[in-house]
């Protein structure tokens, strides 16, 4: 797996993520792109980029903090087990008024 940024917040450089993804996929490598800086400034086409995962932070697009988006190809999302799920993970719930 490789993880790369789409657009650098330090230099402003836009990386050639499509070309990097094509090369990585030719070697069987999964590609994760950090799109937190790129998403607000670039036109995104996930089918064209062909990355396996693309992460976006909403606060970089003037959204609320603590929210984000993780795009993933269907084949990978179907293989990943949930990290946590449903109410079954709750042992104790109290209401404090």
Where are these regions (language model features)?
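Pyridoxal 5′-phosphate
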Residues: 1-95
